[in-house]
Each structure stands twice: as C-alpha cells, then as structure tokens.
Amino acid sequence: MKKANFFKVNELKAKKVLEDSTLRVVTNENTMVSFFEFGPNTTIMPKHKHPHEQTGVVITGSVKMVVGGETKILKVSEGVVIPPNVEHEATPLEPGTKMIDFFYPIREDYLK
C-alpha cells in the first residue's frame, strides 16, 4: 500500500527563479503542485509555453495573465486553466503575489 506524502510548504526546498522569485514543488507519481512567490524585483514571468497542462490559482495579491492572446486580471482565489502548448505570461500587480500551479505531467525542469 502506498503512503501519503504530508508536507509543509515552507519546508519544501526553495529554488530561486527569474530575478528574485521563489519556486517550491511537491510531486506525486503523475502530478506536480508548485508554490510560486513573485519577488519584489520580478516584473514578469516571460511569455513561454510547455507541453504540460497547467492550472494556476492566485493565493495572495493579483496578477495579469496573458494566455493565448487573451488578457485577464486575476485576484485572490481566481485562476486559469492553460492547455498544453499555449503561450502565456504573468505579471504580478502587487508585492508578494503568490500562486499555486498544478501540472500534468510533472515538469522535470522544475525538479533540477
């Protein structure tokens, strides 16, 4: 029988990304959850795409999302579902903006 993986977000290994943002991840066999905190000097998560399904939810602050050419402002408890291979970017609109992202399959690049 497989066991549950209990964790505390603040105890997950922190990885510095972009200029001064922080990424923490936890994985299961097929899925990944990332906890992303925009740093005070990070002005944008540049436009990119990947083969993973992604669902993101704002948990603190607000963010301007551009997904497939469509722009929306997301506030706390609002989110977006991004299909695979669709270009997207995120711009934090408040200091300390945080998001939780769910990925399928696991993003191996986030584990490095």
Predicted regions and their residues:
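Conserved short histidine dyad/triad with adjacent acidic residue
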Residues: 19, 34-49
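Structural motif
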Residues: 32, 42, 62-64, 87, ...
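Short, conserved beta-strand element in jelly-roll/cupin
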Residues: 38-39, 49-65
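Short strand-coil-strand connectors
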Residues: 29, 66-70
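Short acidic-glycine-tyrosine-enriched beta hairpin
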Residues: 70-84
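Ligand-binding loop in jelly-roll beta-barrel domains
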Residues: 84-109
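A short, N-terminal "cap"/entry segment at the start of jelly-roll beta-barrel domains
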Residues: 1-30, 112
